[in-house]
A protein has these predicted regions:
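N-terminal Sec-pathway targeting helices
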Residues: 14-31
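Terminal hydrophobic membrane-targeting helix
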Residues: 15, 34-135, 294-298
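N-terminal leader/targeting segments and the immediate start of mature chains
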Residues: 60, 359-376
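Small-residue helix/turn framework positions
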Residues: 78-98, 117-141, 165-168, 173, ...
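Intrinsic-disorder/low-complexity linker and hinge segments
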Residues: 145-160, 353-365
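A structural feature that tracks compact, well-ordered secondary-structure segments
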Residues: 310, 322-323
Length: 639
């Protein structure tokens, strides 16, 4: 027996829903039929499509269109016209675009009335040549009429409402030329959309491009492009982000009487020097300028820039202040005032060749000045703490001035080593070398700390005061030191001479002259005052009027310091103060020499004189005394 099966179906849709679906399908079919009917006049005519698209582009932008490839109208998924091998030019020749293809997307409402009205376009692989000094928009275009309309007039209001659209560039390339650019700038891999719906609306630019092999993300907003074309101002926002640069501006842009931006600028880059050198500019200061960050209020034009409220950081240094740049003939000038809590000059000196070579002698390599560029400088900098090589300064105020081939570094004043210093050095930079003039003053500085940081000599202490006035010339550091001329004066008060006990030597010189050599280096010699003068002639400084005094001791010294060959030849004689005050009287004295290379000085006592004073050895020598080289005339001993 076979039982019949009953099939139970689901509930049928309500009549209202079935009607809605039917209406939706019918409307879709009707819309497709309407579109098909509307595009029928264009579907079979390449010439008609090309002419209509060219006419609209000419009407909006003023650009002439030349289409050499196939033109086709595509309905789905979005109605658009596709044309291959198309070119655009403006009448003045300022702009030329050669694109692999053009896709013009049309407005649906216009299409239903039988018209093609392009709302946006895509250019594939456009190759663009842009003359930044030209005016590519003719006056009979939508943009040209809007630009020529007087502000706040009915004509301007009408022109501002005309339709434009959006343009997308896919894998494009642009060559920018201008009298201000040398060489031309090439931008590759351009994938950017420019959305400017009508002249009176804002323009938005977004996308990416490649400059010198590096991809940058670009985002820009211009509130009133047509205002700029009419000579008015417009708010502007721009941001560029790339591996080597992050840059943003927010402010206002004006086009009359010249292009000028006013607003806030932020910039950051791993190497400012590399960025500027790629752009054809040289930083007129040494140093890597790495880890650069800056933020400031700025007024920037083609010929000048003023950066105020500047916060600047690079190479581990941070500054606040103002900078200004002015393009002028024969050289531009960078000026400003900066302040910092801590300034290290080590990064600025990192690329400077060492003064001395590995052999311990002065560097003979010729000076190179090409990296400093041609920009003139007028910079004034104050630093609460400044580190220069091994020297530490406080409350330093200095300036860097450059005018043509002359560079001047001036330290107006600073606290250092419990004293004060100031100085000035001027370099005249030439093709065959450099001329130098230097002056300096130190007042009341700690001689122990200063001599250790300067020369690595810990044997001296006291309060040092001195002046120097020097000049030289040469093509290398070696020549510069060999040609030193000038004078210097040094005074030291309330000090000690380490590594030698002269008072003990004088006390023992008659009793045990030979035995004193064993212990002379174990003590120190205190003094109330010491002084000497230096007279430089061709790199050799004569030590003049050298003396060291305390109530019981007088030391006279003289000799030469060879700055060219880094050598010292010093001769000294020590006497008791009472004996030194009695010229002509034969009194015990202790004589010694210090000589050799600066890096390996040798202390040499007058051994022959000590042996002569020894009673056991006296018969071995002539009775006429010859104790060595006199340092000062006996008549000057008490002076």
């Amino acid at each position: 027996m076979v039982e019949s099966a009953t099939v139970v179906s689901g509930p049928s849709p309500p009549p209202r829903k079935r009607l809605s679906r039917i209406l939706f399908v019918l409307i879709g079919i009707a819309l497709l039929v309407a579109i098909a009917a509307a595009v029928a006049p264009w579907a079979f005519s390449n010439a008609a499509l090309r002419n209509e698209v060219a006419s609209q582009i000419r009407r909006m932008t003023g650009l002439a269109t030349l289409a050499q490839g196939h033109a086709v109208f595509v309905v789905l998924p979005q109605p658009h016209v596709s044309i291959d091998d198309v070119s655009f030019t403006d009448p003045s020749g300022s702009l030329r675009i050669d694109a692999h293809y053009l896709k013009g997307y049309v407005r649906l409402a216009a299409l239903l009335t039988g018209r093609i009205e392009i709302s946006s376009a895509t250019l594939g692989q456009p190759d663009m040549r842009i003359d930044l000094d030209g005016r590519p928009m003719p006056p009979d275009s939508v943009i040209g009429r809007a630009a020529d309309a007087a502000p706040a007039t009915p004509e301007a209001a009408s022109a501002d409402e005309a339709r434009l659209g959006a343009v997308t560039l896919v894998d494009g390339r642009a060559r920018l030329i201008s009298k201000h650019l040398s060489p031309d700038v090439t931008i590759d891999a351009i994938n950017v959309t420019v959305d400017w719906r009508k002249p009176g609306a804002a323009a938005i630019v977004t996308g990416q491009a490649q400059i010198r092999g590096e991809t940058a993300t670009i985002a820009a907003w211009i509130a009133s492009p047509v205002g700029l074309l009419r000579g008015q101002q417009s708010p502007l926002s721009l941001k560029i982000v790339a591996p080597s640069l992050s840059f943003s501006v927010d402010g206002g842009l004006a086009s009359v009487p010249e292009w000028q931006f006013g607003g806030y600028i932020r910039a950051a880059t791993p190497s400012l020097r590399a960025i500027l050198e790629q752009a054809g500019y040289a930083i007129p200061l040494p140093g890597p300028f790495g880890d650069f960050e800056a933020g400031c209020d700025a007024v920037v034009s083609a010929q000048s820039a003023v950066l105020s409220g500047l916060r600047l950081r690079f190479d581990g240094n941070e500054f606040e202040g103002t900078l200004a740049y002015q393009a002028r003939d024969p050289a531009p000038v960078l000026s400003g005032t900066l302040a910092t809590n801590r300034l290290s000059l080590r990064p600025f000196l990192s690329g400077v060749p060492p003064a001395a070579g590995r052999d311990g002698q002065w560097n003979r390599d010729p000076f190179e000045f090409r990296e400093v560029g041609s920009t003139d400088l007028d910079l004034r900098i104050s630093a609460a703490h400044m580190l220069f090589s091994h020297f530490e300064l406080e409350d330093a105020a200095f300036s860097v001035m450059r005018n043509s081939g002359r560079l001047e570094l001036a330290l107006a004043g600073a606290k250092a080593y419990q004293g004060a210093i100031k100085g000035r050095v001027t370099f005249d930079l030439g093709d065959t070398g450099v001329g130098m003039q230097a002056t300096g003053t130190v007042i009341g500085a700690d001689f122990a700390a200063l001599s250790f940081d300067a020369f690595g000599w810990p044997e001296f202490n006291g309060s040092v005061t001195g002046t120097a006035n020097l000049e030289s010339s040469g093509a290398s550091m070696y020549e510069l030191m060999r040609n030193l001329d000038g004078t210097a004066q040094i005074d030291v008060a309330q000090g000690q001479l380490g590594g030698i006990d002269l008072e003990s030597a004088l006390h023992r010189i008659d009793k045990s002259p030979l035995a004193l050599l064993a212990g002379i280096h174990r003590g120190r010699t205190a003094f109330d005052h010491a002084s000497f003068n230096l007279r430089f002639v061709k790199g050799i400084a004569s030590i003049e009027e050298g003396k060291l005094e305390n109530p019981s001791l007088w030391l006279g010294f003289g000799g030469t310091v060879d700055f060219g060959e880094r050598g010292l030849d010093l001769h000294a004689v020590a006497k008791s103060a009472a004996d030194a005050a009695a010229p002509g009287k034969e009194v015990p004295d202790f004589r010694f020499d210090i000589g050799g290379s600066w890096d390996d000085l040798a202390f040499t006592p007058d051994v022959r004189g000590l042996i002569r004073r020894s009673g056991a050895a006296a018969p071995l020598f002539p009775q006429k005394r010859d104790a060595g080289k006199p340092v000062v005339p006996s008549g000057d001993a008490g002076q």
